[in-house]
A protein has these predicted regions:
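A short glycine-rich, Lys/Arg-flanked "PGG" loop and its adjoining helix->strand segment in the class I
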Residues: 245-262
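A C-terminal cap/extension of S-adenosyl-L-methionine-dependent methyltransferases
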Residues: 213, 308-353
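Membrane-proximal basic amphipathic "stem/tether" segments
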Residues: 1-74
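A short acidic, Gly/Pro-enriched loop at the edge of an enzyme's catalytic core
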Residues: 219-232
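Conserved Class I S-adenosyl-L-methionine
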Residues: 275-311
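Conserved beta-strand signature within the Rossmann-like core of class I S-adenosyl-L-methionine
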Residues: 261-269
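Conserved alpha-helix/loop element of class I SAM-dependent methyltransferases that forms part
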Residues: 125-144
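Class I SAM-dependent methyltransferase SAM/SAH-binding core
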Residues: 148, 155-221
Length: 353
């Protein structure tokens, strides 16, 4: 090959390499910005907004008037019934999606009252109800039981469980990481046991006796927590661990903290629109049916028991509404994240031998 032609080819190759490098760097920058955006947006999901905005029906109909949205409050849809005095008997919880039907249960009113939460059609309140009910009906919310909370934030659950006689180790990420990721500025991070006190739920002396705090990385659970607890839980945390795989590995690893026969209850984001395409960024991932079903198969092959999946999304009016930013106090059972409609899913897993 002539020398001049070889030089031209090398020159062209060098230009192509430079262009490819610039494109690669630009794509990386865009992915980082996209991940940051969705991570910051997700931090607002559990802090209901009261600003006027729009709710979109699954069929595509927009409702712009705030007074129309207010017509779908808990009181208007379910009623204003008082909470029962004792935990009612209800069908045993399965691994399932958040649905309107659960908000009409006496058990939802009971646990909302116990947690000092207002009755509202909000999926975060459903997650708390789901965790409480799942643990209660399996006999874990009683004196002498031990529980471990992951990514606890400012949840009222440790205070409630302590008031019922449980000893709780509450964990959250280290303060520097929480500050970097934006959880402190939104008031969704705990760095001490004092941050979790709820005097209207549990008397302070009892709380301080039964609740302790540790900083824990959910991607690297310390060995000293292994095999110590009757139950563990997390409420919409594992989707923030870095990827779909990181969250699934956390669920598997969380079982190592349990005694044999102990129960883990975890909630996370579920993709209602697609079993193929989904959102996966360092700050936020949305789980598909295939991800959940694959996890169930894996855990059961390892000898654990997963409560049967019920992925019926419900068929009521509220089940069909998708909340758009700025998000509302209610109804907020389904919401739009990027191009995906999603809701909360709860998983109940018993550690096997």
């Amino acid at each position: 090959m002539p020398v001049m032609r070889m030089l031209k080819i090398r020159f062209i190759d060098s230009i192509i390499e430079r262009i490819a490098e610039r494109v690669s760097n630009r794509v990386a920058d865009l992915l980082e910005q996209r991940a940051l955006f969705f991570s910051e947006t997700k931090k607002l999901f559990d802090q209901p907004e009261t600003d006027s905005g729009a709710i979109v029906c699954a069929g595509g109909q927009l409702i712009h008037q705030r007074n129309e949205i207010e017509c779908m409050s808990y009181a208007k849809v379910i009623g204003e019934l008082p909470p029962p005095q004792h935990p009612p008997e209800v069908p045993r919880r399965r691994s399932e999606l958040c649905k309107q039907a659960d908000f009409s249960l006496d058990a939802y009113r009971y646990w909302s009252s116990a947690l000092r939460l207002p009755l509202t059609l909000h999926r975060k309140h459903w997650e708390f109800f789901y965790i409480c009910q799942a643990l209660h009906e399996r006999g874990f919310l009683s004196t002498g039981r031990t529980g471990l909370a992951f990514g606890v934030g400012r949840e009222p659950l440790p205070a409630l469980f302590a008031s019922l006689g449980c000893a709780i180790v509450a964990t959250d990420q280290v303060s520097d990481d929480a500050s970097r990721d934006g959880w402190q500025i939104t008031g969704q991070h705990a760095d001490s046991v004092a941050a979790l006190e709820k005097p209207n739920i549990c008397a302070p002396p009892t709380f301080r006796e039964r609740v302790s705090f540790e900083a824990v990385d959910m991607n690297s659970i310390p060995v000293h927590l292994a095999g110590r607890f009757d139950f563990c839980w997390s409420a919409c945390c594992l989707e923030h661990l870095g990827s779909l795989g990181h969250g699934l590995r956390f669920i598997e690893n969380s079982l190592n903290t349990l005694k044999i026969g102990g129960v883990a209850v975890h909630t996370t984001e579920f993709n209602l629109l697609s079993n193929a395409a989904t959102l996966e960024t360092p700050g936020l991932s949305i789980y598909r049916r295939c991800d959940i079903e694959g996890l169930v198969r894996q855990l059961e092959e390892m000898g654990h028991h997963v409560e049967p999946l019920n992925l019926n999304p419900g068929a009521t009016l509220i089940d069909g509404y998708i909340d758009l930013p700025p998000y509302h106090e209610e109804p907020h059972l389904r919401l739009r994240i990027a191009e995906y409609d999603c809701t909360s899913i709860g998983l109940i897993i018993t550690r096997g031998t």
